[in-house]
């Protein structure tokens, strides 16, 4: 009992560590957040490991602890949401409510993976011992491998699609028409940049991109059209390569605009790190938000610039 309990806890914690992004541009990053996630994963794994022997002993009141754990993890989600929303006012580029909700939901769901993997590890151990009459050591080894396999499956299933999966990102030129009206690629009228110095900064230091939905799909274009998804793309650019602007410089705030004829999205930025390849990668790696999906399901069989369904 003692051995398999600790094995189940370790497997549960490992399942959480597998999903942690330790890149400084991702979450969790800071040591205090990392520590809190490890502690929460320990609590969740211990609950999952204890649940099996409790059920074997017909102690059904143990289900109460699961409900308390679920409530606690929902509180973690609320706390993460509140923390990120409180930081919005001091961000040069905001994440947006949709992106914040996605992050908070991810924090909650990934704690449940600890319960599932530790529960399966301990449960498989008892099945091997009682039904297949395997030795204690062999049962621990097999159940550990089963728990790790489940952890990999959960990690794969919880991976979100990114912009690179639904769209191509290509560089385009930034220019100005009628002296001060910004044009990105072939889309005019993005915004009015009144100061000559600001226009020169865009022309000399700016980068333009066009995000083109793959297969001319209306569904993919609809994801790009979502305001929350656009804001997430801008924030991902800001977090990866930076943006040259002060809080009192609205001219350099990126304004994504849809080209309705092509269903594409164009963006002009003045990055700190002027590298078009890094900019393209930042856009492609942006996760697709759950709130941006499914809004154009009825048009999934239609193509942009084509009549009728395919």
Predicted features, each with a name:
Residues 1-58, 62:
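Membrane-anchoring hydrophobic segments
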Residues 13-19, 66-78, 144-155:
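Alpha-helical transmembrane segments and their membrane-interface exit regions
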Residues 35-40, 103-116:
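Select subsegments of transmembrane alpha-helices in polytopic membrane proteins
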Residues 63, 114-140:
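Alpha-helical transmembrane segments and their membrane-interface junctions
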Residues 79-92, 159-169:
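A cytosolic-side transmembrane-helix exit/cap motif
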Residues 88-106:
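Short membrane-interface loop/juxtamembrane segments of multi-pass integral membrane proteins
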Residues 129, 133-134, 138-279:
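Long, charge-rich C-terminal accessory regions
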Residues 257-310:
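Long, non-transmembrane cytosolic or organellar matrix-exposed soluble domains/tails
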């Amino acid at each position: 009992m003692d051995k398999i309990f600790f094995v189940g806890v370790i497997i549960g914690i490992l399942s959480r560590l597998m999903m942690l992004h330790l890149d400084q541009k991702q979450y969790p990053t800071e040591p205090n957040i990392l520590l809190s996630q490890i502690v929460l994963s320990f609590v969740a794994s211990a609950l999952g490991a204890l649940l099996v022997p409790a059920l074997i002993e017909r102690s059904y009141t143990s289900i109460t602890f699961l409900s308390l754990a679920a409530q606690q993890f929902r509180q973690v989600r609320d706390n993460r949401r509140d923390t990120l929303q409180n930081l919005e006012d001091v961000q040069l580029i905001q994440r947006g409510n949709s992106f914040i909700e996605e992050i908070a939901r991810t924090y909650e769901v990934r704690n449940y993976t600890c319960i599932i993997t530790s529960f399966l590890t301990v449960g498989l151990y008892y099945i091997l011992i009682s039904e297949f009459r395997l030795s204690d050591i062999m049962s621990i080894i097999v159940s550990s491998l089963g728990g790790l396999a489940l952890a990999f499956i959960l990690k794969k299933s919880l991976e979100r699609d990114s912009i690179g999966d639904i769209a191509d990102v290509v560089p385009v030129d930034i220019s100005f028409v009628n002296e001060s009206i910004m044009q990105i690629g072939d889309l005019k009228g993005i915004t009015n940049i009144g100061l000559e110095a600001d226009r020169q900064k865009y022309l000399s230091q700016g980068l333009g991109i066009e995000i083109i939905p793959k297969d001319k799909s209306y569904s993919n274009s609809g994801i790009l059209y979502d305001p929350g998804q656009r804001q997430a793309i801008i924030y991902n650019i800001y977090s990866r390569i930076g943006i040259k602007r002060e809080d009192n410089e609205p001219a350099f705030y990126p304004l994504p605009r849809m080209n309705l004829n092509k269903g594409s999205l164009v963006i002009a930025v003045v990055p700190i790190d002027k590298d078009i390849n890094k900019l393209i990668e930042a856009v492609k790696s942006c996760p697709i938000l759950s709130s941006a999906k499914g809004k154009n399901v009825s048009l999934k069989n239609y193509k942009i610039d084509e009549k009728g369904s395919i």
